Amino acid sequence: MQIFPQTNELIWTIINFAVLLWGMHRFLYKPLLGAIQAREDEINANLKKAAEDRAEAERLRREFEAQIANAQREAQEIINKAVKNATAVKEQIEAEARARAAEILEQATQTIEREKAKAVAELRREVADLAVAVAGKVIEKSLDDAEHRRLADSFVTEVTKH
């Protein structure tokens, strides 16, 4: 008596199933695992490359930021030097202008003094000439008081004209 009436069929089904599993394992599972492993390796390589690229990008960003900071510092130094040079040039121009103004003022003062001295000398010469002329007139005439007064007034008027 058989426990299962179709035991032969069951055994052949189990054998067929085992052969199918073995074939699938040999021809499908291993290549599928290889493809999955290759894909996993590719993804891991891509992730590793992305991490390396990210690290390189971060390094470049820091390097560029350092270069920008350096360029800004150099630009500020150039600006500071330009301002310092401009201030020095301004101070030099102002000093030269003050010196030139003092020189012009000194020359003008000297010219005024010379002209004043000339005018005083000329006035003295004219006064002396007039005094000599008046003395000559006085000597020529004998003057009374009224004539003397008129002559003095004439002398003063002539002096004030010149």
Curated annotation (Swiss-Prot):
CDD domains: ATP-synt_Fo_b (cd06503). It is found in: Cell membrane. It is a single-pass membrane protein. Its main location: membrane. PANTHER family: ATP SYNTHASE SUBUNIT B, ATP SYNTHASE SUBUNIT B', CHLOROPLASTIC. F(1)F(0) ATP synthase produces ATP from ADP in the presence of a proton or sodium gradient. F-type ATPases consist of two structural domains, F(1) containing the extramembraneous catalytic core and F(0) containing the membrane proton channel, linked together by a central stalk and a peripheral stalk. During catalysis, ATP synthesis in the catalytic domain of F(1) is coupled via a rotary mechanism of the central stalk subunits to proton translocation. Component of the F(0) channel, it forms part of the peripheral stalk, linking F(1) to F(0). This is ATP synthase subunit b. The gene is atpF.
